[in-house]
């Protein structure tokens, strides 16, 4: 399809220029009335009430107001969401702006699983990255406008990131404040997960495994309840987000505390030794354990620090993929805020590792390869029996710190 590109004209130029020069059409009826009055017989008249003063610029002012109102409701040319301004040559929303910037900066290549003609709107823009980038380019967003390594061009809104008065992170006060609150929300510092947790070569007993698993899950939920923006969401959205992401947060917490994952005690904790199981099921189950171990080891190999873990968990938590969200676009914007915080933190703290940010993000999709049902079977069947973890998550959100686990007595 051929695309016609015309020279863009700023709507503000028409507003600033005022009404076009030439005869004022509003003055024509006034001259006709004066001529008619002079031709008519003169009769005494009582003084009339003065009318509103003549304002030659009224028509122009009204046009300016209408133009200003239309400026405030400009749609994103990519997905139709409300535009936040002109980015990379076109009016786009924050989501499409950030997506285009990430794609160009990291020179990402996407693949369409359909016919390369997927609908891109507010509700489907996250389903196909290939078609989304294709539309960004089709509507005229310019690759050359994305400057490598550039700081975000716009200033944050008041209160958007001004969360604490902590020390600035290389001058980025709003980022350091956001990350500081993510870190402060951790209910259990690494040192309080248990002394055995930090000894990977130490084989933990069944009771210790169950205790640690309870801490990791409780920590994920309690952390989410105390981070910025999450408590402001509707409780139904909070439950939906945690129901979808609890297993990913659990894996991240397991990697952060270097949780020992030896096969024998894990199988014992899952109760596989007590119930007969076919050889095929045992092999499949052990394969799931291997996947879990691989994800934890790959994260540990990157030597992810506490601030990075907090940002990564926020990126995982704020996902618009959860079902039934009341405002998926808002959730997506929170994910992008967290991703920007991680990107700037890595750039400032690890300047000699230019690929570090990309490596961290590449670990996120594979977190979902760890089956949540396997995590339940491995760590929680002895703890809660057949009670679904989603039910426990809802109860933890509603009851908060007063929620009691059977294995939460050790401090």
From Swiss-Prot:
A zinc finger (NR C4-type) spans 76-96, 112-136. Residues 174-400 form the NR LBD domain. It is found in: Nucleus. GO terms for cellular component: nucleus. Residues 1-68 are annotated as: Disordered. Residues 24-46 have a biased composition (Low complexity). Gene3D superfamilies: Erythroid Transcription Factor GATA-1, subunit A, Retinoid X Receptor. Its main location: nucleus. SMART domains: HOLI, ZnF_C4. Residues 73-148 bind DNA. Keywords: DNA-binding, Metal-binding, Nucleus, Receptor, Transcription, Transcription regulation, Zinc, Zinc-finger. It holds the Pfam family zf-C4. Coiled coil: none annotated. GO terms for biological process: atrial cardiac muscle cell differentiation; brain segmentation; cardiac atrium morphogenesis; cardiac muscle tissue development; cell differentiation; endothelial cell proliferation; negative regulation of transcription by RNA polymerase II; nervous system development. One of its GO terms (molecular function) is nuclear receptor activity. First expressed in 11-12 hour embryos. In the rostral brain of 13 hour embryos, expressed within the anterior half of the midbrain and the posterior part of the diencephalon. In the presumptive hindbrain, expressed in a segment-like stripe in the anterior region, resembling the presumptive rhombomere units of the hindbrain. Also detected in the intermediate mesoderm, posterior to the first somite. As somitogenesis proceeds, expression extends posteriorly and flanks the 10 most anterior somites. Expression changes extensively both in level and expansion of domains between 13 and 20 hours. The keyword Zinc-finger applies. Putative transcription factor that is required in photoreceptor cells precursors during eye development. Belongs to the nuclear hormone receptor family. NR2 subfamily. This is Nuclear receptor subfamily 2 group F member 1-A. The lineage of its organism: Eukaryota, Metazoa, Chordata, Craniata, Vertebrata.
